[in-house]
Design a protein with these regions (language model features):
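Active-site-proximal helix-loop-helix substrate-binding element of RNase H-like nuclease domains
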Residues: 35-66, 72-175, 276
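Cytochrome P450 core scaffold surrounding the K-helix E-X-X-R motif
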Residues: 23-27, 54-56
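Conserved "right-hand" nucleotidyltransferase catalytic core of DNA-directed polymerases
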Residues: 1-24, 35, 42, 129, ...
C-alpha cells in the first residue's frame, strides 16, 4: 500500500491499539503512559490480513522491534498515547512513520472537530461500531485492562483495531484526493512524533528545591495578604484581597449588601422583647441585610475613560493595568498591591504546585494537545508547560 510517491511512507501499514493498567494516582491521568507502575496489558494490531493480540512483555518487545526494523507506518486513534507506551518497550520513533486518525480528522474538518472519540469518528464515516458499555464504564471507574475479563477485553480490542483500520482506509482515500493538503498533513503527523518524544523525554525538575521555594512563596503570600488588609482596612467592606468582587467594589464603588441585626416586630408593629433569661427585657433581633453605597477609589476621569473606550470596569488584570497607567494616588497603589499579590499566587498555583505534583522521579512529562484549539495552536496540560516564562526562576 503506497501512500505517497515521495518515499516518505512505506508500504507496510500496521494499525494498532493498546489496553493498559490504570494505576497512576491523582492528579495524573490514571492510565498515564509515563507513570512507571502502568504497563500494557494487551496490544492488538492488524497488518495486511493478519490480526493478532499480544499479552506478554516479550511478545510486545518483539513486535516493537519488527515494526521498527521494517519501517512500518503505524496507524492509531489518539496515537500518541499508544506510542508513549510502545517507547517504553523499545520503540524508536525515528524508524517509523505514523498516522493518527484523530489528528487527520482535526485537520480535514478545518479544526472544527477537536478530540473526537473513535465512536464519533466511526459514525462520521458511517461505519457500524459501538464500544462495549460495560467495559467503558469500568475504565471510567478507574479499573484497568488487567481487571477486566480477558475474553471481553479481547473482543473489545479487536473491534477497536478493526474500526480504526476502516477509518484509516476512508481517510486515506480523502488524502489521495486532496493533493494540495498532502504535504501539510505529513508535516502535522511528523509534529505529533516530535511532541510525543518531548513528552517521553520529559523535563528534569528539582522537586525538593521547588518545595522549599514554594514554602518561601507561601510565607510571602501570607505576609502580603496581612499587609494589604492592614493598609486598606479603612476601605468599606474590604476584608479579602483575594476576592475579585471586593477588589472591584473598592476600585469602582457600588452597592454592597451588609449584614445587620434587624429588630423582630410583633403583630402590633412594636419590637418583641425577651420575657425571661439573661436577655430579659432586651429586644429580639434577627439577621438581615442593608444596602450600602461604596465610593470608588478611581477618579471620575478614569471612570469616563473606561466608559468612552468600552473597557470593562472590573478587577481583571487588564483593568488593573489601565488603572496603574491612567489614574493616580490611592487607586494606583491599591491596584499595584493587588497585582503583586496575584503574581505571588500565580507563581505558587501555576508553577510550583502543579510541577511538584506532576513530577515523577524528578521529571515532568507534560501532555501536548494537538486537537483542541480552532487556530491549530499547540496546547499543553498535566501540567501546562506553556505558562513558563523567563521572568520567574523555578
Amino acid at each position: 500500500m503506497n501512500i505517497a510517491g515521495d518515499g516518505f511512507w512505506t508500504q507496510k501499514v500496521t494499525v494498532l491499539d493498546v489496553e493498559t493498567t490504570i494505576r497512576a494516582p491523582l492528579p495524573h491521568f490514571g492510565a498515564s503512559p509515563t507513570y512507571p507502575t502502568n504497563w500494557i496489558v494487551s496490544l492488538g494490531y492488524k497488518h495486511e490480513d493478519k490480526e493478532e493480540q499480544l499479552y506478554s512483555k516479550r511478545s510486545i518487545i518483539e513486535f516493537v522491534h519488527w515494526v521498527g526494523e521494517e519501517a512500518h507506518l503505524i496507524v492509531g486513534h489518539n496515537l500518541s498515547f499508544d506510542l508513549l507506551y510502545l517507547m517504553r518497550y523499545g520503540l524508536n520513533l525515528d524508524f517509523v512513520n505514523i498516522w493518527d486518525t484523530q489528528k487527520y480528522n482535526y485537520i480535514s474538518s478545518g479544526r472544527i472537530d477537536g478530540q473526537v472519540s473513535l465512536e464519533q469518528l466511526a459514525k462520521k464515516y458511517r461505519l457500524p461500531f459501538k464500544k462495549d458499555t460495560e467495559i467503558k464504564e469500568r475504565f471510567r471507574a478507574g479499573l484497568g485492562a488487567d481487571e477486566i475479563d480477558q475474553e471481553l477485553l479481547r473482543i473489545y480490542l479487536k473491534s477497536d483495531v478493526r474500526v480504526t483500520s476502516q477509518i484509516f482506509e476512508k481517510q486515506l482515500e480523502e488524502y489521495r484526493n486532496s493533493e494540495a493538503m498532502q504535504e501539510y498533513i505529513l508535516e502535522m503527523m511528523y509534529s505529533l512524533k516530535v511532541t510525543t518524544d518531548m513528552t517521553y523525554q520529559g523535563m528534569k525538575f528539582n522537586v525538593e528545591g521547588a518545595k522549599e521555594a514554594k514554602k518561601d512563596k507561601t510565607l510571602l503570600l501570607e505576609v502580603q495578604e496581612e499587609r494589604i488588609q492592614e493598609r486598606w482596612k479603612d476601605l468599606y467592606n474590604f476584608t479579602n484581597p483575594n476576592s475579585s468582587s471586593q477588589v472591584a467594589t473598592a476600585l469602582w464603588g457600588g452597592q454592597v449588601k451588609v449584614p445587620v441585626d434587624v429588630e423582630v416586630l410583633g403583630e402590633d408593629g412594636e419590637p418583641v422583647r425577651y420575657k425571661s433569661g439573661d436577655k430579659k427585657g432586651q429586644i429580639k433581633t434577627k439577621k438581615g441585610f442593608s444596602m450600602e453605597t461604596v465610593q470608588p477609589l478611581v477618579s471620575q476621569d478614569t471612570i469616563d475613560l473606561f466608559n468612552n473606550r468600552g473597557w470593562d470596569k472590573n478587577a481583571s488584570a487588564q483593568a488593573l493595568t489601565y488603572i496603574q497607567k491612567y489614574d493616580e494616588g490611592d487607586a494606583v497603589e491599591f491596584a499595584q498591591d493587588i497585582t503583586g499579590l496575584r503574581h505571588i499566587n500565580k507563581t505558587i498555583n501555576t508553577y510550583y504546585k502543579p510541577y511538584i505534583d506532576f513530577a515523577v522521579s524528578e521529571t515532568i512529562h507534560p501532555t501536548y494537545n494537538h486537537c483542541i484549539t480552532q487556530t491549530g495552536r499547540l496546547s499543553s496540560s498535566k501540567p501546562n508547560m506553556q505558562n513558563m516564562n523567563n521572568k520567574e526562576q523555578l
